[in-house]
A protein has these predicted regions:
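A conserved active-site cap/scaffold subdomain adjacent to cofactor or substrate pockets
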Residues: 18-51
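Short, flexible turn/loop "capping" segments at secondary-structure junctions
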Residues: 21-25, 79-83, 140-145
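Single conserved hydrophobic/aromatic residue that forms the stacking wall/gate
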Residues: 1-12
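Short beta-strand-to-turn element immediately C-terminal to the catalytic PLP-Schiff-base lysine
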Residues: 6, 29, 123-124
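Short, well-ordered beta-strand elements within core beta-sheets of diverse protein domains
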Residues: 28-38, 86-93, 149-153
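Conserved small-domain helix->loop->beta segment predominantly found in fold-type I
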Residues: 48-117, 133-139
Length: 173
């Protein structure tokens, strides 16, 4: 009986106070936080360069990035943020087939439904993060079969632009 109540007490404590980490894990987390601002600044600078490089490509119908003057909330972004952030969305002509072809042609950028890594990651929201929504609801939200979301990492922006440009060239052929 005492064992059972102690066990439930531990569960209650974890549910209401969260898990506890080891001292080493805390130290690693602290070391990462010390450079977080520098990393996000660099990633945001790269994201803006990449977003600009995607504008006007014949296979892309739109580039969605709040750091671009063409974004409908650009002024709000300037008021609330120092930079436009690390995530770019862009819409490919050709739908899901084009989106998957582009993702599979990338060499540096990883395919994943995660965000915010030191490595650049691309995802297809319609089949990952938003797959449970109805097609009508996805359409209302602007999540089409051609939409890709790129979370920019710490790689050199020129290398990422080259990787994306190469994958886009493969679509045109």
């Amino acid at each position: 009986d005492a064992l059972m109540s102690r066990g439930l007490g531990d569960v209650y404590k974890r549910q209401h106070t969260g898990g506890s980490m080891s001292p080493f894990t805390g130290w690693v987390l602290l070391k990462g936080l010390e450079t977080l601002d520098l990393r996000v600044q660099a990633q945001s600078d790269s994201a803006l360069e990449i977003a600009k490089s995607l504008i006007g490509h014949e296979s892309i119908s739109s580039v969605i990035y709040p750091g671009l003057e063409t974004h409908p909330q650009y002024d709000l972004c300037r008021e609330q943020m120092e930079k436009g952030g690390t995530v770019i969305a862009f819409e490919l002509l050709g739908g899901k087939e084009a989106a998957f072809s582009l993702m599979n042609s990338l060499e540096l950028v990883l395919i994943s439904n995660n965000l915010g890594d030191a490595k650049s990651i691309i995802t297809h929201p319609a089949t990952t993060t938003h797959q449970r929504l109805s097609a009508d609801r996805r359409q209302q939200l602007g999540i089409t079969q051609g939409l890709l979301r790129l979370s920019v990492g710490l790689e050199d922006s020129k290398d990422l632009i080259k990787d994306l440009s190469s994958a886009l060239r493969n679509l045109v052929r």
